[in-house]
Amino acid sequence: LMLDPVNFAELYKNKTSKSVINLQVGELNRQYELFTPKLSDNESLPILFAFHGGGGRDYPYPQQEKFEELVDEKKIILVFPLSYQLKNNEGEWQLNTSSDSRHDIDFIDTLIDNLSNSYNVDSKRVYATGYSLGSMFTYELACHLNSKITAIASFAGTMPLNMNNCVMNQNVPIMHIHGFNDSIISYSNQWNWKNWDSVGTMLDIPSLINYWKNKYNCQSKNESNTSIYELISYTNCNSSSQVEHYKLNSV
């Protein structure tokens, strides 16, 4: 595997840095934006992956500047992976991953390993968030890379009704944020994903939350409301995991 620059951890040791990195994964040359904090020796760092939405590869991530502020403030490694243009999955993040469509899962798997080799990464704090289609891909990580992903926070996405091979070696705590009036990714209704046959029908948001609540065998439910959102929390789940859902009332 080729990683460029090779020793970026040492190169950017004493300053906040941004760089665009190329990473060869199988036959594909993948890219990602990397932000690292000012480092001190033996400092253990968490990773936060943020996955862009459909068509978002060439544009800043939503509120990207706010995320960048967290790099030094919270001492995190911030990564914006970039999707790869493939015709058979409409050129975006692969959903309903199967044994012959693991290119995006393999990308993140390899990327975690490379970052861990270059930095003192805290393997118990590897997080993923995403917007829209990127949000949907975080559920792929929860299903197919749960041995390395600590938790996910999904914003304005969903997942397929019939999810392939979602085997939990360890449960991944989930936060899902969604606007009740979302006109693109429906909150209340199932919908069909264009002509992408491998994906098919997509879940409405209440069904999405129920899927994970049932999968984790959560026994307790708590609700709290404000004028802006409703928060539903499922706790007392297997392996001390939990599922949280913020329903945004006016969005």
Task: Describe each model-derived feature in a short phrase.
Residues 2-47, 73, 96, 100-105, ...:
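A domain-start/cap signature at the N-terminus of enzymes
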Residues 39, 106-124:
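Conserved acidic catalytic loop of the alpha/beta-hydrolase fold
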Residues 40-89, 149, 161-162, 184:
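Short substrate-entry loop that stabilizes the transition state in hydrolases
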Residues 49-51, 155, 248:
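Alpha/beta-hydrolase
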Residues 63, 116-172, 183:
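Primarily recognizes the serine-hydrolase "nucleophile elbow" in alpha/beta-hydrolase
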Residues 82-103:
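Cap/lid segment of the alpha/beta-hydrolase catalytic domain
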Residues 176-178, 182:
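Short beta-strand/loop motif that positions the catalytic acidic residue
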Residues 184-188, 201-204:
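Conserved alpha/beta-hydrolase "acid-adjacent" motif
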